[in-house]
Curated annotation (Swiss-Prot):
Low complexity composition bias: residue spans: 27-40, 52-61, 90-99
Feature: compositional bias, Basic residues: 41-51, 118-130
Subcellular location: Periplasm
Residues cleaved off as propeptide: 22-80
Position of the signal peptide: 1-21
Pfam families: Asr
Gene Ontology CC annotation, any one: periplasmic space
Coiled coil stretches, renumbered: none
Region spans: Disordered: 27-139
UniProt protein name: Acid shock protein
Organism: Klebsiella pneumoniae
Function: Required for growth and/or survival at acidic conditions.
Domain of life: Bacteria
Lineage summary: Bacteria, Pseudomonadati, Pseudomonadota, Gammaproteobacteria, Enterobacterales
Gene name linked to the record: asr
């Protein structure tokens, strides 16, 4: 893992040959010394390299990000906003009027049906009362 990081950092700086040489030296030193001292020496060397190199990479990335933010998303946002406003003004306004007209016609038709149902219920109650007294004396 440490070797991979060293290679990536070295490749970014353009010193791949120096990185390979540093890796070769660190691998040969590690078996000769104890693990703790080898880890410390290689660790310090990599920290110095990492501290020097990512600073240049970060500056380059920041410059790229600023250029992209100014160029592409600004134009895309304006186009999207224009599209949204056109859709809201054109399409939903006409269907809403048609739906409102349909709802009003249906509302006028429904109360008439309710009156008919109420009239039917009243007639049924009178028919049942008239039918019950005639059925009792016959039984």
């Amino acid at each position: 893992m440490k070797k991979v990081l060293a290679l990536v950092v070295a490749a970014a700086m353009g010193l791949s040959s120096a990185a390979f040489a540093a890796d070769a030296v660190s691998t040969t030193q590690a078996p000769a010394a104890t693990h703790s001292t080898a880890a410390k020496t290689t660790h310090h060397k990599k920290h110095h390299k990492a501290a020097a190199k990512p600073a240049a990479e970060q500056k380059a990335q920041a410059a790229k990000k600023h250029k992209k933010a100014e160029a592409k998303p600004a134009a895309a946002q304006k186009a999207q906003a224009a599209k949204k406003h056109k859709k809201v003004a054109a399409k939903p306004a006409a269907p809403q009027k048609a739906q409102a007209a349909k709802k009003h016609h249906k509302a006028a038709a429904k109360p008439a049906a309710q009156k008919a149902q109420a009239a039917k219920k009243h007639h049924k109650t009178t028919k049942h009362q008239a039918a019950k007294p005639t059925a009792q004396p016959a039984a």
